[in-house]
Swiss-Prot record:
Glycans are attached at N156. Residues 324-336 have a biased composition (Low complexity). Residues 1-31 form the signal peptide. PANTHER family: TUMOR NECROSIS FACTOR RECEPTOR SUPERFAMILY MEMBER 19L. The lineage of its organism: Eukaryota, Metazoa, Chordata, Craniata, Vertebrata. This is Tumor necrosis factor receptor superfamily member 19L. Phosphorylated in vitro by OXSR1. Phosphorylated by STK39.
């Protein structure tokens, strides 16, 4: 052989050796199949195959429904779509959703479509007309076993309560304004009645009892206080009438105006101890125009004369103890009248306001013909009145009756047979005569 042939053989032998030396530093690779392995339904590939197992069971809450090499998928949550669970999920089956929850509506047969609230539903929606009577689809398959022998978990039977009670809300919204309007209307009517003079009260007025109607006693004459005296009852009965109160106010105003005129045009008078009594004149320090005792001097007229009708009357004993001496103011233009009627003989003045005078007559037993007389006469006579001229030779009682003049009417009370009489009172007001 030639030398060239030997060189070619030597080159062919060195080529595999050089390739071997090049591949020796690389790590040895394990043989792998061309396609990955597949796991059965209910299992997923094991990420750690060191235990000798290539697949593992799906964890709770997940499932795998076919042969594949993917991990298990979580179960579907029906509550997110406001639906009820018709069948609970297993390792090989997903959760099956049923009808919509109470208060929600949605298309039937499409479990993965979310439900809508009934407040947005049309009037003829089938799911919202029934209140609380909503069936659950797939309840019959909630129990038992599956086709492959695995036990089925019972479905969730709870229902979401309806948060919207539209009927009750509408009723409350309608009732509250009605009550408010009724209250405002009642207040308005009460104010209108008060302006017209009526009295609005929330309590029922107690009327006369059925049994007390036949007593024949006028309720106006029934005293509220058992200790109230006769003068108090008389004054209360007079002042209860609006007409009498207005008349007394007019008399007081007229009396005050006359006093102001007299004091403004006349000098300070000088007191005469022997003159008869004039009820219009106020001696200031010793008068009983009011029932509070002696009054202090305040200007031309005492402060007690400026007051209106008193509230409490003076007792007859105090009035008798503090009766002032009669006085008279002389005037240059007009002489004092001789016909001015002083108090009757034996009378004790109780109250004197203007021309209104209340006096007390003590009991008199000297005469058997007349026991007592009650009259209402004028406190101050007119210009044309004549002085009293009682006839001589008559008893004192008849003189008292005849002393008032012929123009006034007298009523005589026949004597009571063997009956003790109590103190009587005389009320004199203006120019009218009246017997009580």
């Amino acid at each position: 052989m030639s030398l060239q042939g030997l060189m070619m053989k030597r080159t062919l032998l060195c080529w595999p050796l050089s390739c071997l030396f090049v591949l020796l530093p690389w790590p040895l690779a394990t043989p792998t199949p061309i396609t990955p392995w597949l796991c059965p339904p209910g299992k997923e590939p094991d990420p750690d195959p060191g235990q000798g197992t290539l697949c593992r069971t799906c964890p709770p809450g997940t499932f795998s429904a076919s042969w594949n090499s993917y991990p298990c998928q979580p179960h579907y949550r029906c509550s997110l779509q406001k639906r009820l669970e018709a069948q609970a999920g297993t390792a090989t089956h997903d959760t099956m959703c049923g009808d919509c929850q109470h208060g929600w509506f949605g298309p039937q047969g499409v479990p993965h479509v979310p439900c809508q609230p009934c407040s947005k539903a049309p009037p003829s929606t089938g799911g919202c007309d029934e209140s609380g009577r909503r069936g659950r689809r797939g309840v019959e398959v909630a129990a038992g076993t599956s086709s492959n022998g695995e036990p089925r978990q019972p479905g969730n039977g709870t229902r979401a309560g309806g948060p919207e009670e539209t009927a009750a809300q509408y009723a409350v919204i309608a009732i509250v304004p009605v009550f408010c309007l009724m209250g405002l209307l009642g207040i308005l009517v009460c104010n209108l009645l008060k302006r017209k003079g009526y009295h609005c009260t929330a309590q029922k007025e107690v009327g006369p009892s059925p049994g007390g109607g036949g007593s024949g006693i006028n309720p106006a004459y029934r005293t509220e206080d058992a200790n109230e005296d006769t003068i108090g009852v008389l004054v209360r009965l007079i002042t209860e009438k609006k007409e009498n109160a207005a008349a007394l106010e007019e008399l007081l105003k007229e009396y005050h105006s006359k006093q102001l005129v007299q004091t403004s045009h006349r000098p300070v008078p000088r007191l005469l101890p022997a003159s008869p009594s004039i009820p219009h004149i106020c001696p200031h320090h010793h008068h009983l125009h009011t029932v509070q005792g002696l009054a202090s001097l305040s200007g031309p007229c005492c402060s007690r004369c400026s007051q209106k009708w008193p509230e409490v009357l003076l007792s007859p004993e105090a009035a008798a103890a503090t009766t002032p001496a009669p006085t008279l103011l002389p005037t240059a233009s007009r002489a004092p009248k001789a016909s001015a009627k002083p108090g009757r003989q034996g009378e004790i003045t109780i109250l004197s306001v203007g021309r209104f005078r209340v006096a007390r007559i003590p009991e008199q037993r000297t005469s058997s013909l007349l026991s007592e007389v009650k009259t209402i006469t004028e406190a101050g006579p007119s210009e044309g009145d004549l002085p009293d001229s009682p006839q001589p030779g008559l008893p004192p009682e008849q003189r008292a009756l005849l002393g008032s003049g012929g123009s006034h009417t007298k009523w005589l009370k026949p004597p009571a047979e063997n009956k003790a009489e109590e103190n009587r009172y005389v009320v004199r007001l203006s120019e009218s005569n009246l017997v009580i």
